[in-house]
């Protein structure tokens, strides 16, 4: 496992780097997730294996450190991922992100176009969302006060969703709450506004039982490919793993 300091206190972001051919592929997990749980089997699948692969645990998640004075905004995450890519001696990578990881991937591709050659996002938020106790996971988390979420809310959400607990227990409650606030707040310009003018190949993946994609017409008009996975919800890598792999492999196949 590799590590790199990402703040003035020496807090470390950590990742796995497996050898393979270029272009390298970088995978970014979602909120309260980990790299190996979200993408370990995906990246090692025969249809995707053979490329150099970076599986990054984002700050506050998994094996990475979780400083209490860090912002956990999308731009802050994107800056860390950019630093990891550069530390690995890479450029023009294929970037794949799920949920919050997809938001971060969009921001990174827009801020640092020199680092990204192809972009695949799976059910990433494209627009800011209001905190909402009945909304998406990030909306429910951000609706709670930070102190309340840290003291009781994070544990309560894990108790209500035992499957989610398997990765959430490896994450820091404060970091998860601030990350959720970052997701619903979004970027400036918005993720959609950053995504549309990009000139690299872009694919947006959604599950037919997952989150509603608002404004697909704007994506299609800008040349973003939209792929739907049948029988999959938001956690498509678990619901339909073979179809998820096939969709990513197709998105990362160079067009001739």
Where are these regions (language model features)?
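Active-site loop/oxyanion-hole signature of alpha/beta-hydrolase fold enzymes
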Residues: 40, 52-96, 246-249
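Conserved HGGG/HGGXW glycine-rich cap/lid loop of the alpha/beta-hydrolase fold
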Residues: 9-65
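Glycine-rich His-Gly loop
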Residues: 27-31, 99, 207
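Gly/Ala-rich beta-loop-alpha elbow adjacent to hydrolase catalytic centers
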Residues: 97, 101, 105
């Amino acid at each position: 496992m590799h590590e790199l300091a990402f703040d003035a206190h020496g807090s470390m972001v950590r990742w796995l780097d497996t050898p393979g051919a270029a272009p390298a592929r970088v995978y970014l997990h979602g909120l309260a997730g980990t790299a190996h749980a979200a993408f370990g089997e995906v990246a090692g699948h025969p249809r995707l294996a053979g490329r150099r692969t970076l599986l990054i645990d984002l700050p506050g998640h998994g094996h990475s450190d979780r400083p209490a004075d860090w912002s956990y905004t999308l731009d802050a995450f994107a800056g860390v991922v950019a630093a990891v890519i550069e530390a690995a001696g890479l450029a023009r990578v294929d970037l794949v992100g799920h949920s919050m990881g997809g938001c971060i991937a969009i921001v990174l591709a827009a801020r640092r176009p020199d680092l990204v050659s192809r972009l695949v996002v799976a059910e990433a938020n494209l627009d800011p969302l209001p905190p909402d106790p009945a909304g998406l996971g990030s909306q429910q988390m951000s609706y709670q006060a930070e102190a309340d979420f840290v003291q009781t809310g994070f544990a309560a959400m894990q108790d209500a969703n035992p499957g989610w607990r398997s990765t959430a227990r490896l994450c820091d409650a404060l970091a998860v709450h601030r990350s959720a606030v970052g997701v619903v707040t979004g970027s400036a310009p918005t993720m959609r506004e950053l995504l549309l003018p990009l000139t690299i190949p872009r694919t947006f993946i959604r599950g037919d039982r997952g989150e509603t994609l608002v404004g697909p017409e704007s994506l299609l008009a800008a040349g973003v490919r939209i792929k739907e996975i049948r029988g999959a919800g938001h956690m498509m890598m678990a619901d339909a793993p073979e179809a998820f792999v096939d969709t990513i492999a197709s998105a990362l196949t160079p067009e001739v």
